């Protein structure tokens, strides 16, 4: 069985567009369940213990960038450089496939106006399609795991998932989605799920890339993990940017 761990960057609300980050990014990693629950946990916990002395610390982009919640030592330049060097080396060795959808909110809104679909719904469609393609014809071959947030946002996500099971997507019928994916589970950050932490680390570098900012080592590694076609093309297969 495969697991799709998903996380987001940016606000999906079209009435709020930040000029410095006018994007909504929904990204995720597709990973084999046995690997995710055993070897992956062991590898990442070793990294945490090596860097911070314990495996309970939760890798979270917002905390890392703000030197808080256990990451206070990152304020030291030498330690910060070592941390990112070790983190990039770690992620490079891990076995997963990256998928993401980026919605350019300002362009999306100006093109479709009142008919513009909610960026979360639209990007979830894209990720579910690609997850189904990775699962293939296997019955109950996958499950989606997302981070629990607040009741309103969690309810919206439940509705988005229900909508997919009823209507399907442009390229994947509702019948195929329900056959291949057993459900969408919401889990708390405090549960320390490594898969969710890796998904969190994916989305910001992808957003920076789409904004045209300088490409750093973290995105180069993610790019090498993107789902791609037989020719190795990842644009449109692993990373979808909308509107086209």
Segments (PLM) and residue ranges:
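Phosphate-ester processing/binding pockets and catalytic centers
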Residues: 1-244
């Amino acid at each position: 069985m495969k697991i799709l761990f998903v996380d987001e960057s940016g606000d999906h609300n079209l009435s709020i567009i930040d000029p410095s980050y006018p994007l909504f990014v929904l990204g995720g990693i597709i990973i084999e369940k046995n690997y995710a629950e055993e070897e992956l946990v062991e590898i990442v916990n070793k990294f945490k213990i090596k860097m911070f002395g314990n495996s309970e610390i939760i890798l979270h982009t917002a905390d890392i960038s703000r030197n808080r919640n256990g990451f206070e030592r990152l304020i030291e330049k030498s330690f910060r450089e070592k941390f990112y060097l070790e983190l990039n080396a770690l992620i490079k060795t891990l076995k997963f496939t990256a998928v993401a959808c980026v919605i350019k909110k300002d362009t999306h809104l100006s093109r479709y106006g009142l008919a513009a679909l909610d960026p979360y719904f639209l990007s979830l469609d894209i990720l579910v399609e690609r997850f189904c393609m990775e699962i293939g014809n296997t019955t109950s071959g996958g499950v989606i795991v997302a981070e629990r947030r607040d009741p309103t946002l969690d309810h919206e996500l439940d509705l988005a998932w229900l909508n997919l099971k009823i209507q399907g997507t442009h390229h994947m019928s509702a019948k195929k989605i329900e056959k291949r994916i057993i459900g969408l589970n919401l889990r708390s950050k405090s549960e320390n799920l490594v898969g969710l932490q890796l998904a969190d680390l994916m989305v910001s570098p992808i957003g920076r890339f789409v904004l045209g900012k300088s490409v750093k080592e973290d995105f180069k590694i993610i790019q090498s993990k993107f789902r791609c076609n037989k020719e190795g093309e990842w644009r449109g297969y692993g990373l979808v940017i909308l509107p086209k």
